[in-house]
């Protein structure tokens, strides 16, 4: 993962 929340793999 590179972002804490992204549209490809949403980390809620």
Curated annotation (Swiss-Prot):
Query: Could you tell me in which tissues this protein is expressed?
Result: Expressed in the brain, subesophageal ganglion and in the retrocerebral complex (mainly corpora allata).
For the biological process aspect of GO, one term held by this record is:
neuropeptide signaling pathway
A GO CC annotation given for this chain: extracellular region
Indicate where the modification Leucine amide is found in the sequence: 12
UniProt record similarity statement: Belongs to the pyrokinin family.
Top-rank taxon, per record: Eukaryota
Alphabetical keyword list: Amidation, Neuropeptide, Secreted
Per UniProt, subcellular location reads as: Secreted
Chief subcellular location equals secreted
- The name on file for this protein is Pyrokinin-4
Q: What does this protein do?
A: Mediates visceral muscle contractile activity (myotropic activity).
């Amino acid at each position: 993962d590179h972002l804490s929340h992204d549209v490809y793999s949403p980390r809620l």
